[in-house]
Amino acid sequence: MAVIKAVSSKAGIGQALDYVTKEEKTEDKLVSGLHCEPDTVKDEMAATKELWGKTGGRTYKHFVQSYHKDEHITPEQAHKNAVELAKNTEAWKGHEVLIATHIDRGHIHSHFIVNSVNYENGHKLQWSKADLQNLKDRCNEQSRQQGLHVPEKGKTFSGEEREETVAVSYTHLRAHETLANLV
């Protein structure tokens, strides 16, 4: 079962690239570049931004494709899947993308660092909820074709019903506590 998510980060692009390419996380072999070379990706992404005069604002988008710890997939196949997803993501056409598959935790996961500036036309990456859903759908189809689990909303990896959880904001929680103290 592979899950795709967009990562919100305050780290600069250099820090993000350094993190995802750490040798102990990737065994120094599960790193690929789409429209860039892994060894020179920082310079290439910076050059694209300089070329088009777009060095400010959001400098990259970060995504992760994670497999459940009990999924039967090799790190090499997970990396191959990630590269295939990146190549076929329409919104990423013309953007440098670094793909790094990590094997240092209990589950295999791949990071995608996407340059925010298109090297062909200088346009900034426009990413919508529909684009993310399309990426998730293609990831699910990839899993289906390989006989891997496909995530089902409200179910665990083994297919059992997940306990219902409720997300509460900190502000809402504090207001609730204040009301309880008044009573």
Range-by-range predicted roles:
Residues 172-175, 179-183:
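Single conserved hydrophobic/aromatic residue that forms the stacking wall/gate
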Residues 1-174:
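N-terminal nicking endonuclease/strand-transfer module with a His-rich metal-binding environment
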